[in-house]
């Protein structure tokens, strides 16, 4: 069973496996790999396992595998020489200036060697100078070939061969070989041969060419010519046409009379010398025709031959200005990089962020803790002591306080109780003073490691161990310290805290290194890594904030315009940025509001691909889509309502009147089915009055046609409305036809005084109370669903109505109608309309076939209801 710890180590199981030995190598003389100072190793038989890339130390760290010092010096020297020869900066120009003076001196001496007065004196100096030049150039060439290996593309013999094929390297080897050959073959008693001197002069020109190693001059010329190639080609082409035409015409004019123009080649030579404004004067036209032609073409051709000079001059000026501006822009790189770095550290050192550790680790490696003070035991005074090295501290603790840093130590006799505790920084052991350790439980390492110090001291030879420390380490495997290296540069400046297992209430001041303290017991201590203190973190945070502000100010200063062109470019860039933002804003507005209809050609016929336009993703397009869906739903609802009306037999006029009502109708009152059933059982005749979808009047549900007819005296009305109509449907609650649901009339019809005929209908029902002969059978009445609609009209419709006015029922009369089913006459009929010429008080609805109604005599429960007076 293998258990992994938090630090990536592997702890062996208790059964059948070898125990690992954990120790600080370098503290114990007999420990393996004692050359590694302060390295905490896990000595075991297992091979080192492969770790991730993130867990590997940096290449520059001291803990990683260092290359030999010879290789490091080799690479460093190689890079240095390559930069001096190929990329000279600073003082490296001194060498190149020396080479230039050497080459220039050789050129001057070679010139003086051609003069008879100075020939003898210059030949001796030139010979010596040529030897020096050859030696310098030869050494420089081989150094260049060797130093080119610092570049990855020039490594190896193939890379060196590739570097040697460069144009300037070819020129170098040619000059070197030719100079050696000239000196070897042409020198006889320090006197050069004439042919050797001539070849040497030519080699001086090649030496001057090689002075521009980086080719900046040729690159600048090539860039200018390439940038203005069209203008140059145009000027040269027109100038060449002028040259040919002028030479040919002058040749024709001067051919027979001037000996200077015997051939067309002579005319071309004259034209070239004339148009380039050189004018040797060896050839010139003599006739007036030739002079006139020469003057005309000279005025035209000279301007075109002079154009390339102006084009190249302006191009060079613009290029130089651009290079200066580019250098000015390159100066912004360092402030920009510093601003980015300081901004990241300002962000990463936020104390509320707990997920960023690399920046704090950088400060843990680089921040040096200041000097700390301590009181000496002998003199009782305070003095400054530099920070101790980690290794020296651990050795002192190990040798003086009896610390054990090995998990499986060899058996040794336990120390006596009187063994002295010589730990100078142990705060858990009582001493002779009453103060705690002066380090205040924290010790920081010094920047440099003292590896070899104290190895041979007698303190390192005596090793004491604490049984309590060994027992605690064996009992709690989770407290095994992590495997980290003191020699690693990235961890060389970690902070340590000393924890004492015993109480520190009676602890006294520890002595400085070199002083002994007698103690009764050993000092079990534990070293664990600790982060930076909160105060130090706050200080680092403040420094990062200040650096960020300073970097921001420097970067703003570097953004100042260089010249007027820079200002114009900044304004142009701002204008382009503004236009792009306006375009983006316009696109967003178009996406929200929607674009207008696109202007298309009327004559152009739409193809099959253009028949269906894509959906508009804008808000207006979506609203249009929703509107179309609402219209589609409205059509579907109209279709369903029409089907329902046709199925139930509802006339369309009622629905139109209902939907045309100005005021919403209140909810109809609810009547229980039991009450309605009791009325039906008692009287067997029910008048169901409902409100249709288009009317506020009454509906009289009479017996179905299948019921036996009843002989009743006709009414005085000329046309009683007794024909049945099909019902509108069942009750909303799902009951049978006995349910009576009488909605209240609208608000404008609730007043009894609004119409004169409001009490007439109630009197008609009272008169029908004692006529049981006209009562239909109960079963037929329950199944009947016919109704007569009495629509309500306003004053405008009153004039257009058939009878001149209509009868409306008030709410009180409708309530009386529900409570007086037993008093309805058997042959009573409710007339929804009144004939022409008949008033509402002319006659009774039924002939006197029974006793007079109770309302006429004022007796009975409805005696207070009287007839309404005639309208006047």
From Swiss-Prot:
Residues 317-539 are annotated as: Mediates interaction with calmodulin. It catalyses: K(+)(in) = K(+)(out); Rb(+)(in) = Rb(+)(out); Cs(+)(in) = Cs(+)(out); Na(+)(in) = Na(+)(out). Disulfide bonds: none annotated. Residues 458-475, 715-724 have a biased composition (Polar residues). Residues 402-422, 442-488, 598-619, 659-680, 693-757, 838-872 are annotated as: Disordered. Changing residue 207 to W: In BFNS1; phenotype manifestations include myokymia in some patients; leads to a shift of voltage-dependent activation of the channel and a dramatic slowing of activation upon depolarization. In adult and fetal brain. Highly expressed in areas containing neuronal cell bodies, low in spinal cord and corpus callosum. Isoform 2 is preferentially expressed in differentiated neurons. Isoform 6 is prominent in fetal brain, undifferentiated neuroblastoma cells and brain tumors. A motif (Selectivity filter) lies at residues 277-282. The modification Phosphoserine is found at residues 52, 466, 468, 472, 476, 478, 507, 672, 801, 803. Phosphatidylinositol-4,5-bisphosphate (PIP2) potentiates the activation of KCNQ channels by enhancing the electro-mechanical coupling of the voltage-sensing domain (VSD) and the pore-forming domain (PD). In the closed state of the channel, PIP2 is anchored at the S2-S3 loop; upon channel activation, PIP2 interacts with the S4-S5 linker and is involved in channel gating. Calcium suppresses KCNQ2 and KCNQ2-KCNQ3 channel currents, with calcium-bound calmodulin inducing a change in channel configuration which leads to the reduction of channel affinity for PIP2 and subsequent current suppression. Changing residue 217 to A: In BFNS1; also in patients with infantile seizures; no effect on channel current or expression. Signal peptide: none annotated. Changing residue 89 to A: Increased voltage sensitivity of KNCQ2 channel. The modification Phosphothreonine is found at residue 217. GO terms for cellular component: axon initial segment; membrane; node of Ranvier; plasma membrane; synapse; voltage-gated potassium channel complex. Residues 600-609 have a biased composition (Basic and acidic residues). Residues 1-90, 146-163, 216-227, 315-872 are cytoplasmic. Changing residue 87 to A: No change in voltage activation of KNCQ2 channel. Changing residue 201 to C: In DEE7; gain-of-function mutation; results in loss of voltage-dependent channel gating and highly increased potassium currents. It is a multi-pass membrane protein. Changing residue 196 to V: In BFNS1; with infantile seizures. SUPFAM superfamilies: Voltage-gated potassium channels. Pore-forming subunit of the voltage-gated potassium (Kv) M-channel which is responsible for the M-current, a key controller of neuronal excitability. M-channel is composed of pore-forming subunits KCNQ2 and KCNQ3 assembled as heterotetramers. The native M-current has a slowly activating and deactivating potassium conductance which plays a critical role in determining the subthreshold electrical excitability of neurons as well as the responsiveness to synaptic inputs. Each subunit contains six transmembrane segments (S1-S6) with S1-S4 forming one voltage sensing domain (VSD) and S5-S6 contributing to form one quarter of an interlocking pore-forming domain (PD). The S4-S5 linker preferentially interacts with PIP2 in the open-state KCNQ2 channel, whereas the S2-S3 loop interacts with PIP2 in the closed state. This is Potassium voltage-gated channel subfamily KQT member 2. It comes from Homo sapiens. The lineage of its organism: Eukaryota, Metazoa, Chordata, Craniata, Vertebrata.
């Amino acid at each position: 069973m293998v258990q992994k710890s938090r630090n990536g180590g592997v702890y062996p199981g208790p059964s059948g496996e070898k125990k690992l030995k954990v120790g600080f190598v370098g503290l114990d003389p007999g420990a393996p790999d004692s050359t590694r100072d302060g390295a905490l190793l896990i000595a075991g038989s297992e091979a080192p396992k492969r770790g991730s890339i993130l867990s590997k130390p940096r290449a520059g760290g001291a803990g990683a595998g260092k290359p030999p010092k010879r290789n490091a010096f080799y690479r460093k020297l190689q890079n240095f020489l390559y930069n001096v020869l190929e990329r000279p900066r600073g003082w490296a120009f001194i060498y190149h200036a020396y080479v230039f003076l050497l080459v220039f001196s050789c050129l001057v001496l070679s010139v003086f060697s051609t003069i008879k007065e100075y020939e003898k004196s210059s030949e001796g100096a030139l010979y010596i100078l040529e030897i020096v030049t050859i030696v310098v150039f030869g050494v420089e060439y081989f150094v260049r070939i060797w130093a080119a290996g610092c570049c990855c593309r020039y490594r190896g013999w193939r890379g060196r061969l590739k570097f040697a094929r460069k144009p300037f390297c070819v020129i170098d080897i040619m000059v070197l070989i030719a100079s050696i050959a000239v000196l070897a073959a042409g020198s006889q008693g320090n006197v050069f041969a004439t042919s050797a001197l001539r070849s040497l002069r030519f080699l001086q020109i090649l030496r001057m060419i090689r002075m521009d190693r980086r080719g900046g001059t040729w690159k600048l010329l090539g860039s200018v010519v390439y940038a203005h190639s069209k203008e140059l080609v145009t000027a040269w082409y027109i100038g060449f046409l002028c040259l040919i035409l002028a030479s040919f015409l002058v040749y024709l004019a001067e051919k027979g009379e001037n000996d200077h123009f015997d051939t067309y080649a002579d005319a071309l030579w004259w034209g070239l010398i004339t148009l380039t404004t050189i004018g040797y004067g060896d050839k010139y036209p003599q006739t007036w025709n030739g002079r006139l032609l020469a003057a005309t073409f000279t005025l035209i051709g000279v301007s075109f031959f002079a154009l390339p000079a102006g084009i190249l001059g302006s191009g060079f000026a613009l290029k130089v200005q651009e290079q200066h501006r580019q250098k000015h822009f390159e100066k912004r790189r360092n402030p920009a990089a510093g601003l980015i770095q300081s901004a990241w550290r300002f962000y990463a050192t936020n104390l509320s962020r707990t997920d960023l550790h690399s920046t704090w680790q950088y400060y843990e490696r680089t921040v040096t803790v200041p000097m700390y003070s301590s009181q000496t035991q002998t003199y009782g005074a305070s003095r400054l002591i530099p920070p101790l090295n980690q290794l020296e501290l651990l050795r002192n603790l190990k040798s003086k306080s009896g610390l054990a840093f090995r998990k499986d130590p060899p058996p040794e006799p336990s120390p006596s109780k009187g063994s002295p505790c010589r730990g100078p920084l142990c705060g858990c052991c009582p001493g002779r003073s009453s103060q705690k350790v002066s380090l205040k439980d924290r010790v920081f390492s010094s920047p440099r490691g003292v590896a070899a110090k104290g190895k041979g001291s007698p303190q390192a030879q005596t090793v004491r161990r604490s049984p309590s420390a060994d027992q605690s380490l064996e009992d709690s495997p989770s407290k095994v310290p992590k495997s980290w290296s003191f020699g690693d540069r990235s961890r060389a400046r970690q902070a340590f805290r000393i924890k004492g297992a015993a109480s520190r209430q009676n602890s006294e001041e520890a002595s400085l290194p070199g002083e002994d303290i007698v103690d009764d017991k050993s000092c079990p201590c534990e070293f664990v890594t600790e982060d930076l203190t909160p105060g130090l973190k706050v200080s680092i945070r403040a420094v990062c904030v200040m650096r960020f502000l300073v970097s921001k100010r420097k970067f703003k200063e570097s953004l100042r315009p260089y010249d007027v062109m820079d200002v114009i470019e900044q304004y142009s860039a701002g204008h382009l940025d503004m236009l792009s933002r306006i375009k983006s804003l316009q696109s967003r507005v178009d996406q929200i509001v929607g674009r207008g209809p696109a202007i298309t050609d009327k004559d152009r016929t739409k193809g099959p691909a253009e028949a269906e336009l894509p959906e508009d993703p804008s808000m207006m397009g979506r609203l249009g889509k929703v509107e179309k869906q609402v219209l589609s739903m409205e059509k579907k609802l109209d279709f369903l309502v029409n089907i329902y009306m046709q199925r139930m037999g509802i006339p369309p006029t009622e629905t139109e009147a209902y939907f045309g009502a100005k005021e919403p109708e209140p909810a109809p009152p609810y009547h229980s089915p039991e009450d309605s059933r009791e009325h039906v059982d008692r009287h067997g005749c029910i008048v169901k009055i409902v409100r249709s979808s288009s009317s506020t009047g009454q509906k009289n549900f009479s017996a179905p046609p299948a019921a036996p007819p009843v002989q009743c005296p006709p009414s005085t009305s000329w046309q009683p409305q007794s024909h049945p109509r099909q019902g509108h449907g069942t009750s909303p609650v799902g009951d049978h036809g006995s349910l009576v649901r009488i909605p209240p009339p609208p608000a404008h019809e609730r007043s009894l005084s609004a119409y004169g005929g409001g009490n007439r209908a109630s009197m008609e029902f009272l008169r029908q109370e004692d006529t049981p002969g006209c009562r239909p059978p109960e079963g037929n009445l329950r199944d009947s669903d016919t109704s007569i609609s009495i629509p309500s009209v306003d004053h405008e419709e009153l004039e257009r109505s058939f009878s001149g006015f209509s009868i409306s029922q008030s709410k009180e009369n409708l309530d009386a109608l529900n409570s007086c089913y037993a008093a309805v006459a058997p042959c009573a009929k409710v007339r929804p309309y009144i004939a022409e010429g008949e008033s509402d008080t002319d006659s009774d609805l039924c002939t006197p076939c029974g006793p007079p109604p109770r309302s006429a005599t004022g007796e009975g429960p409805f005696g207070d209801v009287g007839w309404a007076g005639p309208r006047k």
